Amino acid sequence: MKKIVIKIGGNAATQLTPAFFDTIKFWQKQHYKIAIVHGGGDTISALMSQLNEPVQKINGIRFTTQNGINITKMALLGQVQPALLESCRVNGLSVIGLNAASDQLLTGHTIDQDTFGYVGNIHQVNTKLIHNLWEKNLIPIIAPMAITNSGQWLNVNADHAATALAKYLKADELYLLTDVSGVKIKGNVLQNLTSKTMEELQKKQMITGGMIPKVNSALFAARHGVRAVHITNTVTHPGTIVTI
């Protein structure tokens, strides 16, 4: 049973192509098991601005207050996820929306509360829930938030949430979908990228900006047993395959 985790951007509900849905349906006919994690950063920022909540980023991480958590839940669970579920339904996929509170799906801890507020990483996944849904031929669509053991909601980077899910589900493949076709060096997409090559390219400042945490997330997944991690803009193209 092949298991595939896909991370898509929060605005992907309006950008996913017919080829995306056709590929997912083809995989399901091959009895592949699929889980999708969605982002939503732009929607969160827009809603924060509307509600006069300061948007502050530290080293690329959104500082999140308790009010910020409430707004994040409104954006992800009230706007982004419903739009994505509807898009999948219209295109013939049987999906179900999940969040951290769905039978304790995602348990996490803060990474540095003094610096980042209620931002965390995931250290436990209720994989039994996912497997039960897979047995019913449902595709879980999961919001990137976690809950601590004491019940505090946390904001989680969507790439990190997808890699954690892939790790605990022992996924065979992970797709980190982005707005470019892969990791580009001098305008050309790298077909393969290893941790050693990544270090060399970083030293030469040839991988910079937002691609660095994405590649690091991919390497984390590869180190934890995911055989193929793709950084790409579509599931129909392998993009850059990251391995250890």
Swiss-Prot record:
Keywords: Amino-acid biosynthesis, Arginine biosynthesis, ATP-binding, Cytoplasm, Kinase, Nucleotide-binding, Transferase. It catalyses: N-acetyl-L-glutamate + ATP = N-acetyl-L-glutamyl 5-phosphate + ADP. Gene3D superfamilies: Acetylglutamate kinase-like. Substrate binds at G40, G41, R62, N155. Pathway: Amino-acid biosynthesis; L-arginine biosynthesis; N(2)-acetyl-L-ornithine from L-glutamate: step 2/4. The keyword Magnesium does not apply. CDD domains: AAK_NAGK-like. It is found in: Cytoplasm. Its EC number is 2.7.2.8. Its main location: cytoplasm. It comes from the Bacteria. One of its GO terms (biological process) is arginine biosynthetic process via ornithine. It is an enzyme of class 2 (transferase). The record marks K7, K214 as: Transition state stabilizer. GO terms for molecular function: acetylglutamate kinase activity; ATP binding. It holds the Pfam family AA_kinase. Catalyzes the ATP-dependent phosphorylation of N-acetyl-L-glutamate. Belongs to the acetylglutamate kinase family. ArgB subfamily. This is Acetylglutamate kinase. It comes from Leuconostoc mesenteroides subsp. mesenteroides (strain ATCC 8293 / DSM 20343 / BCRC 11652 / CCM 1803 / JCM 6124 / NCDO 523 / NBRC 100496 / NCIMB 8023 / NCTC 12954 / NRRL B-1118 / 37Y).
